[in-house]
Amino acid sequence: MLVPKRVKHRREFRGKMRGEAKGGKEVAFGEYGLQATTSHWITNRQIEAARIAMTRYMKRGGKVWIKIFPHKSYTAKAIGVRMGSGKGAPEGWVAPVKRGKIMFEIADVPEEVAREALRLASHKLPVKTKFVKREAE
């Protein structure tokens, strides 16, 4: 599971998810990629579930790059606790993903296999996605 080794602040502000991703909008390492078309928080568990779905379909062939990292903590109060009395305890880790960001990349597999593997991975994620190919240099 992806988690930061150490953080400066345990509890973070939620922040805004406006606009497009600044960088990481092109396929950089692999041949095919999975690009977000909407913005959302993606948890470390969702990233792991997507990774497992891809690698199992590819039968551990090919190469996978995970281009997002859950560096932001999110908090939650216990069920039945009244409002007030401070911010809740850290609950987990999320990667804020804006539209346009390439989240996963795949190489060394045929296009049909890559397309299906990324389709399976997209079902594990809370964002709408599209399959993209590396542009020829």
Curated annotation (Swiss-Prot):
A GO biological-process term: translation
Q: Which domain of life is it from?
A: Bacteria
Q: Which keywords accompany this UniProt record?
A: Ribonucleoprotein, Ribosomal protein, RNA-binding, rRNA-binding, tRNA-binding
Q: Which gene encodes it?
A: rplP
What Pfam families would the database entry show? Ribosomal_L16
Q: Name its species.
A: Streptococcus mutans serotype c (strain ATCC 700610 / UA159)
Q: How does it assemble?
A: Part of the 50S ribosomal subunit.
Q: Report the CDD domains cross-referenced here.
A: Ribosomal_L16_L10e (cd01433)
- Keyword check for Cell inner membrane, yes or no: no
Q: What is this protein called?
A: Large ribosomal subunit protein uL16
